């Protein structure tokens, strides 16, 4: 679902205008600019992404009806609408294959013995 449609759903559910919610919903879908298929969701569509949304937007905000809203509620709705549940970051990461580059650069150690240097990987 596009951020605008998420925002309209939030306005129907919580009151106010769709513009009150659009920035939160756009936050979750910004990862599409880095990876334009559904795998972009691995970056923010999780309990971790919901936590990050609270860090970015604060725990609450006031909508245009004057109602104090929890960012977490809006963020959870976004993830649930797209995923059907709220996955953990571990659920996403467990679905990925480990690659050697993920561990960072591999340093070769050199041991000097009586016979000269020996390279060990």
Task: Tell where the protein language model's regions lie, with residue ranges.
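N-terminal membrane-targeting hydrophobic helices
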Residues: 1-121
């Amino acid at each position: 679902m596009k951020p605008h449609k998420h925002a309209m759903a939030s306005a129907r559910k919580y009151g106010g205008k769709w513009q009150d919610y659009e920035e939160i919903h756009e936050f979750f879908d910004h990862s599409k600019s880095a990876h334009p298929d559904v795998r972009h969701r691995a970056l923010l569509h999780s309990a971790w992404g919901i936590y990050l949304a609270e860090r970015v937007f604060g725990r609450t905000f006031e909508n245009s009806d004057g109602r104090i809203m929890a960012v977490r509620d809006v963020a959870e709705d976004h993830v649930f609408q797209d995923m059907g549940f709220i996955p953990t970051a571990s659920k996403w990461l467990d679905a990925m294959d480990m690659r050697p580059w993920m561990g960072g650069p591999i340093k070769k150690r050199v041991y000097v013995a009586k016979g000269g240097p020996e390279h060990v990987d």
